[in-house]
Amino acid sequence: MNFVFISPHFPENYWNFCDRLRANGVNVLGIGDAPYETLPALLKSALTEYYRVDNMENYDEMLRAMGFFTFKYGKIDWVESNNEYWLEQDARLRTDFNITTGIKSAEIEKFKRKSVMKTYYQKAGIPTARWCVTADVTEAQAFAKTVGWPVIAKPDNGVGANGTHKFKNKTELNKFFQQEGPSAANYILEEFVDGEIVTFDGVADANAEPIYAASHVTPDSIMEIAHGKKPMWYYVAPEISPELRKMGEAALKAFGAKSRFFHLEFFRLKTAKPSLGNAGDILGLEVNMRPAGGYTVDMLNYAGGLDLYQIWADMVAFGAAHHPLARYHRYCCCAGRHDELRYRMPHEELLKKYRSCLNAAPRLPEVLAREMGDQLYIASFEDEAAMQAFRRDALARPRE
């Protein structure tokens, strides 16, 4: 089996995917823009060959790289980056080289555009917040009048909180439409939801059924975290509620999420709202057909005592898991600190106090630090009370 892994060097933990594929007997070929000599030794040992391109945005270069591998190794069976940024290019390469193990260009829209995602959530019988897409400020005002303030605007094709706006009144909404003009149609307007994000994460088989699934919770608004108003904090829950599992499995079927990682996002309402539901009810938010970002895959591993990189590689090579799934169910949390801020408990003291619970304390590159923090702490706990005590110690600021 020939597997072309796109950008195997970034994110930095993605060498694990290549390593597990190779362990399963897969011929792993890499395409990236990093010089070969800068690749980690563990990645080099997992790759049969690496083709460096000057610019991964240049599709002609990517075609030449794929053509080279096809000529040298025969038909390519898989192309995957497991990276949101390259999903559309992955699909285009599959289309051009007739690779049938993943989604092609004609279908990629449902994995990228939020407005299209809403229709697939509806197909799965999953409620969502009300929304509209328009470049007409009058229509936008009418929508806001219907759903009430505040109103959220997000890029229809985008990920995370990048480019997200929160309008508290008509003046702010009008200013946005004046600035954007016709480009406002590239945004989706949504009613505001007071909820925490809960996810359905895992690996799906060729029938869009989960081989393994877990869930993590982000109590604070992603937009507030991204804008620096709230610290990075989220955790893997030890169990998935029956309602969330039912919705997650229905969404996988509706979206046709076959043979791939999935990261499905839902709102769990903090307060009741007549148009949405009661506190605790779950709404569909958006889908990401790749692993959750940052160190979440590692956190899922720590929480469950498994190797999700290996489970994914088993799916690729064998269509099912050939290695153990979760051996236990713990909380695993991630807290992020920013270098420019002071915290009540110094770094070294935090490391010492929680040395038996800490799984990792990585520094983040600048490209990720703005949203997540410069310094992360990943720790596992048997119970929620111990985890919340860690949160207080990790994130508490000095008293004024």
Protein language model features and the residues they cover:
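ATP-binding N-terminal substructure of ATP-dependent carboxylate-amine bond-forming enzymes
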Residues: 1-106, 138, 321, 383-399
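Conserved ATP-binding module of the ATP-grasp superfamily
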Residues: 127-130, 150-153, 164-199, 221-233, ...
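ATP-dependent carboxylate/phosphate-activation module, predominantly the ATP-grasp catalytic core
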Residues: 191-257, 261, 268, 272, ...
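Peripheral (often C-terminal) accessory segments that flank ATP-dependent C-N-forming ligase machineries
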Residues: 313-400
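ATP-grasp fold ATP-binding core
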Residues: 121, 144-166, 184-201, 213-217, ...
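Alpha-helix N-cap recognition
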Residues: 136, 167-171, 346, 383
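Glycine-rich phosphate-binding loop signature in dinucleotide/nucleotide-binding domains
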Residues: 69-76, 145-147, 182-183
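A conserved helix-loop-beta module that forms one wall/lid of the active-site cleft
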Residues: 94-163
